[in-house]
């Protein structure tokens, strides 16, 4: 089963998700999605999600061990696509208004200077951009998502009440630990 991570926060009373956009060389399924991919060997879906998330976010959310610790500390809200095909692990994350800017500037800088063949073949350049997207904007943004991820977007919209409760509960837990 393939899997990915989807950082989520509550900001100004609304749910926000951090999505990644594929680089310009992805022609078969361009657009936004979570940070994920296929499993390696005998990985669990969570192990796959952590490895893929670390690769696609190029360490911006920490090492694999730091991501694992964060996901295990607060748990994940899971959305499955086509039973046993793909799982998105939604997890709470503190909103960082500069994360988009730093990641996107870093990617632009590096990708402008590297040989395009490196960008095409390296796992760490799959996402050219990240973006915080409010749940209220998901319906109109559906055409901008990767075609296979639209089903997960639909499930996120349908389950927004449960996701909000999960994130709010986790945020309360995090605040008590700080």
What kind of feature is each model-predicted range?
Residues 13, 21-28, 61, 72-80, ...:
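Conserved, well-structured beta-alpha core segment at the onset of a catalytic domain
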Residues 1-35, 89:
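N-terminal strand-loop-strand
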Residues 12-13, 25-26, 40, 93-99:
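Short, charged/polar surface micro-motifs in flexible loops or helix N-caps
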């Amino acid at each position: 089963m393939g899997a990915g991570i989807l950082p989520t926060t509550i900001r100004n009373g609304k749910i926000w998700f951090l999505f990644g956009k594929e680089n310009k060389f992805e022609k078969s399924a361009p657009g936004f999605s979570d940070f994920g991919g296929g499993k390696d060997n005998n990985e669990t879906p969570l192990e796959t999600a952590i490895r893929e998330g670390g690769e696609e976010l190029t360490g911006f959310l920490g090492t694999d061990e730091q991501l694992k610790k964060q996901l295990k500390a607060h748990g994940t809200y899971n959305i499955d696509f086509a039973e046993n095909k793909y799982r998105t692990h939604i997890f709470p994350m503190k909103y960082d208004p500069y994360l988009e800017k730093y990641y996107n500037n870093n990617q632009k800088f590096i990708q402008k200077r590297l040989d395009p063949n490196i960008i095409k073949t390296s796992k760490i350049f799959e996402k050219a951009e990240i973006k915080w997207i409010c749940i209220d904007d998901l319906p109109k943004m559906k055409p901008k998502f990767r075609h296979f991820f639209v089903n997960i977007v639909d499930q996120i919209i349908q389950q927004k009440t449960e996701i909000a409760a999960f994130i709010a509960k986790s945020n309360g837990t995090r605040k008590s630990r700080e």
